[in-house]
Amino acid sequence: MADSKSGDTEVAHRSSDPSEKRGGWITLPFMLVTLLGMSITSFGWGMNLIVFLIEEFHIKNIAAAQISNVVNGVVNMLPVVAAILADSFFGNIPVISTSTFISLAGTSLLTLITSLNYLMPRPCETGSILCQSPSKLQLGILYVALALVIIGSAGTRFTLAAAGANQYKKPKEQGRFFNWFFLALYIGAITGTTAIVYTQDNASWKLGFGLCAVANLISFIVFIAGVRFYKHDKPLGSPYTSLIRVLVAATMKRKAVISSKDEDYHQYGLGKEAKTYTTMPSKSFRFLNRAALKNKEDLNTSGDSSNNMWRLCSVQEVEDFKAILRLVPLWAAVMFLSTPVAVQMSMTVLQALVMDRKLSPHFEVSAGSLQVIVLVFGCVFIMLNNWIIYPMYQKLIGKPLTPLQQVGIGHVFTILSMAISAVVEAKRLKTVENGGHPMSVLWLVPALVMVGIGEAFHFPANVAVFYGEFPESLKNTATSLTSVVIGISFYLSTAVIDVIQRTTSWLPNDINHGRVDNVYWVVVIGGVLNLGYFLVCSWFYKYRNLKDDDHEQDPKDVKT
């Protein structure tokens, strides 16, 4: 009877908790519209950045490509900072609302820069090859604007993913949300890469950046309007402290003999972690098991565990730390997967600038808009994968494709895209050498299609792996890790381009006198080596939280 009463009391308490009544599918429109607007904004100013720097600020081609890589690197690195702030201090909702406002300030400043002549260098004189360089003041204001839009974009993209997934309790509902999330992300990216970039190239930069600011403003208003429906997860302090504690405790007890008895280990976690602890630490990374091992110094006079949190951790805290360590090799493989793509994106813009971009006498493709091909085919194949390819594979083989298998397929398509790019560039250089008419920009399409298909396989799967396998208290960090990988890859691509430029003659300012095809073959070789490394890592990796039934395609998901 006592148990029954306590159970009824607990149910009554939960039903009276306002946070329990929030969340669910009512939040989906607010989340998706916010994401859609922010995607239009970030891709609108970001995809044409190289062209903007070259044409309006008179920065040299390779230097502009390098600046773009650095900007993209920061955009994708900073989400982990936003994740730390959300996980440890403020929660998702305040971080997202603040970030959208900061982004709005940045897009407004970009609009102002292109509206006032004295904030940009004077246009080049007709027929002159010498153009006025930007002043320090002009560059300074430009960098402030870029810093604001970078912070705003970084604080929303993957924090929105974690905030949206937090609105649902069941893993399958979270999976369905991620499908909608990536669909909205790609639709926004396509819109920004086509409509906004076309406006910048054919109307004015002022109008293009102004439209970015409008989309940003709509995102901010819609997100704030939905606050009363969101489920707010209160941060329980820094989850990173427990990770450091595991290292400290294991080091302090490094001479202790590891026990094989479960009663010798401290079993109790805190908060959400208390319900998921294991009775015995796993055998992998056994030296860390000492952090949860109880000895005389860890017991107080009453025989209970000591209150010294730096000497004794729970088994669950140890296992959480191990889970992160197991993911590090896979994380590195994803990083080296994204590096060739970052190189390719920069080189593709430079190639397009010296190719025939006219599709008709009255229509010319923007060099920055070519990335839309990646987004379109990524969007299409995300839908095909979830609604046709994955269910068909499951029906034929009898078991679903695991996330790591999906990532492996993405590796293959990425390598194929680099090889195609190398062949096309060799043909283009041959045409230039023979004095023929510039090749059509459509020759770049097949490689970009392969990149898009590859992203449809590996991008959502990587997010699913990190989100599913990371500890409960680090879910924001989990979703941001994919972005961090992309950010590091942009820095690595900048380093690769810099090394090639210093050691070879393949990348002059005029790529018609270079060998960009050789650059592509270098990244093809790197991609093949990385694929081999990934296959070894994935072969030995054992899923911690994700089970086979989590990968299975639900008919309801297909309809949705």
UniProtKB/Swiss-Prot annotation:
GO terms for molecular function: chloride transmembrane transporter activity. The keyword Transmembrane helix applies. It is a multi-pass membrane protein. GO terms for cellular component: membrane. Its main location: membrane. The chain crosses the membrane at residues 34-54, 77-97, 101-121, 141-161, 177-197, 207-227, 323-343, 372-392, 404-424, 441-461, 480-500, 520-540. Keywords: Membrane, Nitrate assimilation, Transmembrane, Transmembrane helix, Transport. GO terms for biological process: cellular response to salt; chloride transport; nitrate assimilation; oligopeptide transport. It comes from the Eukaryota. Expressed in the root epidermis or cortex. It is found in: Membrane. Residues 1-20 are annotated as: Disordered. Gene3D superfamilies: MFS general substrate transporter like domains (1.20.1250.20). It holds the Pfam family PTR2. Belongs to the major facilitator superfamily. Proton-dependent oligopeptide transporter (POT/PTR) (TC 2.A.17) family. Transporter involved in a passive nitrate efflux. This is Protein NRT1/ PTR FAMILY 2.5. It comes from Arabidopsis thaliana (Mouse-ear cress). The gene is NPF2.5.
